[in-house]
């Protein structure tokens, strides 16, 4: 009799303790608890809050700051491009001016065949005609018959260099000739060379 009454007493104790009833033959479902074993796995504040207005403000500030940085970077790059364009425009203007000058000098009257590498002296008659001569004002001395306008050197590309720029232009041409005449020597070994890096 006592054994038969034991299960009843046990069921009563379980019911008073709030144990869930069995779900069929498969057993009971596990109860949900926010702190299993006394430890919180997630933050209830972050999982249950509807939204923090401060986060939206911070996000908007971040987007605005990014826009400002992007605008500043684009402005800096455009400034560099504008400076390059201005420099190219100045170079283009100088090229056109030099081409116009060279064309005019090639149409100046001259009784000799002009040869590249020589310096020619430009004079102007009383009639207004301009002409080239191989005689310099120094060679004429005080008996120079006409007004001296300038001296030019005929380059091998048939361009003209003013007398005051001849030395600088010759230095540039000499440097370019030196670079073009140098042969590019390949290293004897294409494998990595660690000489001097190891003890």
Curated annotation (Swiss-Prot):
Stretch forming the signal peptide: none
Any one GO molecular function term: identical protein binding
Keywords: Coiled coil
Coiled coil: 71-101
Positions of transmembrane segments: none
Region (Disordered): 1-30
Presence of the UniProt keyword Coiled coil in the record: yes
Disulphide connectivity of cysteines: none
One Pfam family hit: DUF2452
Protein name: Uncharacterized protein C1orf50
Taxonomic source organism: Homo sapiens (Human)
Upper lineage: Eukaryota, Metazoa, Chordata, Craniata, Vertebrata
Encoding gene per record: C1orf50
């Amino acid at each position: 009799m006592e054994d038969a009454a034991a299960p009843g007493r046990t069921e009563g104790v379980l019911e008073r303790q709030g144990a869930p009833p069995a779900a069929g033959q498969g057993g009971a479902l596990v109860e949900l608890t926010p702190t299993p074993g006394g430890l919180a796995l997630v933050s209830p504040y972050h999982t249950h809050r509807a939204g923090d207005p401060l986060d939206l403000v911070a996000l908007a500030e971040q987007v605005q700051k990014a826009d400002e940085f992007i605008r500043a970077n684009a402005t800096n790059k455009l400034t560099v491009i504008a400076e390059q364009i201005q420099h190219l425009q100045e170079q283009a203007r100088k090229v056109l001016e030099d081409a116009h000058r060279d064309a005019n000098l090639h149409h100046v009257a001259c009784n000799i065949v002009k040869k590249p590498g020589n310096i020619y002296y430009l004079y102007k008659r009383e009639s207004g005609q301009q002409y080239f001569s191989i005689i310099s004002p120094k060679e004429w001395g005080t008996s120079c018959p006409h007004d001296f306008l300038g001296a030019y050197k005929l380059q091998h590309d048939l361009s003209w260099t003013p007398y005051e720029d001849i030395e600088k232009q010759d230095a540039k041409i000499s440097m370019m000739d030196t670079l073009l005449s140098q042969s590019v020597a390949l290293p004897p070994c294409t494998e990595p060379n660690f000489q001097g890096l190891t003890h």
